[in-house]
Amino acid sequence: MPLTQTPSIFTVSRLNQSVRLLLEQEMGQVWISGEISNFTQPASGHWYFTLKDDTAQVRCAMFRNSNRRVTFRPQHGQQVLVRANITLYEPRGDYQIIVESMQPAGEGLLQQRYEQLKQQLAAEGLFDPALKKPLPSPARQVGVITSKTGAALHDVLNVLRRRDPSLPVVIYPTAVQGDDAPAQIVRAIELANLRDECDVLIVGRGGGSLEDLWSFNDERVARAIFASRIPIVSAVGHETDVTIADFVADLRAPTPSAAAEIVSRNQLELLRQVQALQQRLEMAMDYSLANRQQRFTRLHHRLEQQHPQLRLARQQTLLMRLRQRMDNALDSRMRHATQRQTRLMQRLNQQQPLPRLHRASARVQQLEYRLGQIVAARLSHTRERFGNAITHLEAVSPLATLARGYSVTTAQDGNVLKATKQVRPGDTLTTRLADGWVESEVRQITPAKKTRKKKTG
């Protein structure tokens, strides 16, 4: 007779254990929607209830460490969405589910859609940190995409006025709640990119329920944020509210006010920049004045080494040009410095840093006064030395010799007359005296008699 294989024989315990493992390993974690009934909460704090629909029911348990995170009190007959693990209670062989999280049915379905879209976009790389665009520092103009009547816009504008009142703001009004809101938000983002007038955008709204914030979990909005060439800061709801837009944006701010803080500069930073610019201005003025003074000294020394009147005149002309250039350069620097100071003071006046601004203004006035005194003293000293040099040159000038009674006579060819053989009767001669010229005609030429030396015997 052929041998027959003995079938496997399970004990009840082994059977229940095998079924439990099969359920836990094969089914894993699932989402289940249904109606609560037979809800109880013993002293242990755990929740026990039945989840049912029109044709079936299943026993459920939700342990205390999980049900503490539920934000509402479950009621009999309430429709809910739960995330649970399927298992088997071995001692009694009861099939049941262990609930990890619970939400009202409406929010639960939205949460399920949220998780599905989040996984899809993450798989496509829309959340990749390497693709995040850096924010400009500092921002030259900020765009705000939100409701024009909402509290979020009010909060953003208040923060920007307090921190950086000179920062321009462009508002792109849009609905942030309702069926039309996602399309309007997408159009606002596309419009901001088309106009290209801002270098950073704040996209967001105030707090609300999951349904209120759902526009920012819309796939169209997420893809518009990802496609934006302009960096986007998301600011949706409160710090505990996290939307799909937060994952896609280049930076997430917990609130609209925090977003305004991120994209703006504060008054202290601007004041530090003004102080640094003032220090650079003072150093540039001192350096320029020292260079001009050294150059003037060298030119004056070279001028003193020149004796002929013509060279002196040339050096005088050069000195005047250099002095004019120096004056123009100083005037130009002072004008540019004054204009820059005026612009900075206007910005500071808008931010009310009055005590430091008064001190800075007083310092600039002192420097202007000192600069005027130094330039005036240098010019006076130069004029005095230049006058002395002219007096000295005039003392040794040929004109001074003429003033003592001498004269210079030139022939018709313009050469200085040194001998009688250079002229003939009838020639016209020109004689230079100290106070003018005299023209005369030669009538007679009488050579001087040569003096003979006596012979020594």
Curated annotation (Swiss-Prot):
Family: Belongs to the XseA family.
Subunit and partners: Heterooligomer composed of large and small subunits.
Name the UniProt record assigns to this protein: Exodeoxyribonuclease 7 large subunit
Enzyme's top EC category: hydrolase
Catalysed reactions, semicolon-separated: Exonucleolytic cleavage in either 5'- to 3'- or 3'- to 5'-direction to yield nucleoside 5'-phosphates
Localization, UniProt: Cytoplasm
The encoding gene: xseA
Annotated keywords: Cytoplasm, Exonuclease, Hydrolase, Nuclease
CDD domains cross-referenced by the UniProt entry: ExoVII_LU_OBF
